[in-house]
């Protein structure tokens, strides 16, 4: 059974993913000693067949209302944390290991009030592509960039029927994503069924 490290294991999508048939190791900020910006708090793991990085932010506001520390916090969670994890566990990854990162549709489409998150997630996609080329053929890296998915983190964006309808109508399929939609894609990318896919978003 593949051994998979999940970073941000308390997220709703992560909880759905953990119903799949993998041997999961969980890291979450709810662990008192774990700090995504401090690699000395990362547990030692000898071997891994895969890694999924979930930590993210939903910090939407007009550009004029952002403070420097808002951008900094979003970048730390979305990008620097990912870099720290990848650097720390690179040598633990087995041959043919698979890494899945999480971006957002906002990284590639201009959306109002998304200045900070779009910048951060574009960085995640660029890093994923770069490392996919650098770490091939031993390790595969792919990124998922979903539209809005119903989770606790996004519930303030969908907490009325009017809000939900507006968001649904913007999507070609006229519906909001569910956690299982993303978990199924991650499961596929972690599996050998995607063994000829790397560097994709």
Predicted regions and their residues:
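Substrate-binding pocket helix/loop in short-chain dehydrogenase/reductase
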Residues: 62-63, 70-75, 163-167
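Active-site loop-to-helix junction immediately N-terminal to the catalytic Tyr of the SDR YXXXK motif
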Residues: 66, 110-118, 130
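Active-site helix of classical SDR
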Residues: 86, 120, 128
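Residue(s) in the substrate-gating loop at a strand-loop-helix junction
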Residues: 104
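Alpha-helical segment proximal to the catalytic Tyr-Lys
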Residues: 91, 132-137, 195
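Canonical Rossmann dinucleotide-binding motif of NAD(H)/NADP(H)-dependent dehydrogenases/reductases
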Residues: 1-25
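C-terminal substrate-recognition "lid" of short-chain dehydrogenase/reductases
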Residues: 175-201
């Amino acid at each position: 059974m593949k051994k998979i490290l999940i970073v941000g294991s308390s997220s709703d999508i992560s909880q759905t993913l953990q119903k799949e048939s993998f041997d999961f190791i969980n890291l979450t900020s709810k662990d008192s000693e774990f700090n995504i910006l401090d690699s000395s708090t990362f547990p030692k793991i000898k071997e891994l067949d895969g890694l999924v990085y979930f930590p993210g932010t939903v910090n939407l506001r007009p550009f004029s209302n952002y403070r420097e520390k808002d951008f900094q916090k979003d970048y730390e969670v979305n990008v620097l944390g990912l870099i720290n994890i990848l650097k720390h566990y690179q040598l633990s990854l087995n041959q043919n290991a698979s890494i899945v990162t999480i971006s957002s549709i906002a990284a590639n489409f201009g959306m109002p009030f998304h200045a900070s998150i779009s910048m951060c997630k574009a960085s995640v996609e660029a890093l994923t592509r770069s490392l996919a080329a650098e770490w091939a053929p031993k390790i595969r890296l792919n990124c998922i960039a979903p539209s809005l998915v119903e989770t606790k983190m996004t519930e303030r964006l969908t907490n009325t029927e009017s809000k939900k309808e507006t968001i649904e109508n913007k999507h070609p399929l006229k519906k909001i994503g569910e956690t299982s939609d993303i978990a199924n894609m991650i499961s596929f990318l972690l599996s050998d069924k995607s063994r000829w896919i790397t560097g994709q978003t």
